[in-house]
Amino acid sequence: WAEAVGLLEAHLSGRDYLFGARPSFGDFGLWGQVYNCLVDPTPGGILREKGPSVVAWVERMLDPKASGDFEAWEALAPTLAPFVQRMCGDLFLPWSEANAKALVGGDETYDVELDGRTWTQKPVKYQAKSLAAIW
């Protein structure tokens, strides 16, 4: 979580929303998850300590307003691409793929290696359905 906050802090420092000066579907999709972390004492403490721009974004999203345009990808990529690569490419997609394979195989539980550590859990149907929609 601290790593995600750090990457998001680097991206939101100096911009109002994920893609520039107006909220996007991405902001609304991510906001709910981060808001819930902010109001929980443990992840909220990490967020307040390491992510003042992220906290400001969460608060801004309570009453979002467009104040300008979306930025070009060239301006966004240096800080947004590392966040997306790390959180989605390195962690979420490998987990999601292992989950889907476990469901197809009828497995009670499955293991997936993430960041050199083994994660074990029961497969969940909703995430497999979501993966199928984007795959």
Walk through the language-model features, giving the residues of each.
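GST-like fold's C-terminal all-alpha helical module
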Residues: 1-59, 63-67, 72-135
